[in-house]
Amino acid sequence: MKKTFFLLFCLLIAVSACRQSMRTVPADNPRQGTTEEEASVESFYDEQKASEARNEQPATNIRMMELPAPLKDRPEQILRKKGFTISYNKKTKVPNWVAWHLTKSHTYGRMQRHNEVFTPDDEVPSPRAIDDDYYTSRYDRGHMCPAGDNKWDAQAMRESFLFSNICPQNHGLNKNEWNDLEIKCREWAREFGAVDIVCGPVFGLHDNEMQQKTIGKNKVWVPDAFFKVVLCRKGYPKAIGFIYKNQGKFQRMSECVYTVDEIERITGIDFYPLLNDNIEDRVEADARLSDW
């Protein structure tokens, strides 16, 4: 199905001579050697591969199948939280992506969000997002990994309110369509036993970075849209993707469906690299809401 939003991205790709592909955040400079940031990312992925080779559970106590491939075209700092993993971007002050393995049991719990407050993440460098950046912005503090997926544990719930897991999000989208999608993902986790989820911001509607909208004194980037990809590994594996514009105008879920391949082209992120190649190729090329 052709969608206006996807065509817009494709058009930008075609007319931008300076871009080879649609990227969420271009690199600041060509990388020379291995930076401390790169070494940290490589160490994280090496640790997970070593754990898998020893048939051990990874140190994060979550399955690592949901993790995208390392990013080379933008800043990336991997943050391992109890209930999810963050790829943080020090330039945009928001995550590149947030990934988690949502099980049926994790959709239940006693932890309540009204007991929590939004907090700067001390693991990321300054300047970083703080509450003051949002006060007069008219944007909600939008969760990437939702509080509703972290009711199972006090630490997981608390960490979901770190600003490294938050993006400036239109109020209408946050309270309506995005919330509906979060609820739908929990329903799928209960139905299938578990799902692997990755979501994050989409940038790229501005060829000139000076046109990028920001909020607050720390210049937190405002996304043009948000993506979410969901993988079910049970039985005959399947995957589905979504992109919602960061706006208040109503967006029907069925009209926001994308294949994972399409979202990879738009975001420049390689999803589910640990899947068997044959399975990955198949599930990423097809997306039908009716299959879910």
Task: Describe each PLM feature range.
Residues 8-14:
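Bacterial N-terminal signal peptides
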